[in-house]
């Protein structure tokens, strides 16, 4: 699966980038809000949704999906910082 970066170039989807970004935002938030398992679940859900679209997905679309999943856990402050 391909993603479309902000500069218009395409790159292969890498689930680890979501895990790293959410983990970093969570750590920067002070006390951890999400468990590693919750972060993995978010990343896997986003990967599943992107695959279902059957097209290249923009970074912005992925960010929106991640934010929505973070908010679904009740971690609204973290979603804002992400």
Positions of PLM-derived features:
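Long, C-terminal-biased catalytic regions of enzyme "large/alpha" subunits
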Residues: 1-82
């Amino acid at each position: 699966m391909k993603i479309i970066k902000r500069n218009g170039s395409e790159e292969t989807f890498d689930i680890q980038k979501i895990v790293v970004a959410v983990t970093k935002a969570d750590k920067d938030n002070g006390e951890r809000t999400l468990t590693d398992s919750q972060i993995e679940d978010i990343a896997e859900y986003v990967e599943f949704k992107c695959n279902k679209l059957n097209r290249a997905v923009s970074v912005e679309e992925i960010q929106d999906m991640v934010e929505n999943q973070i908010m679904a856990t009740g971690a609204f402050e973290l979603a804002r910082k992400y």
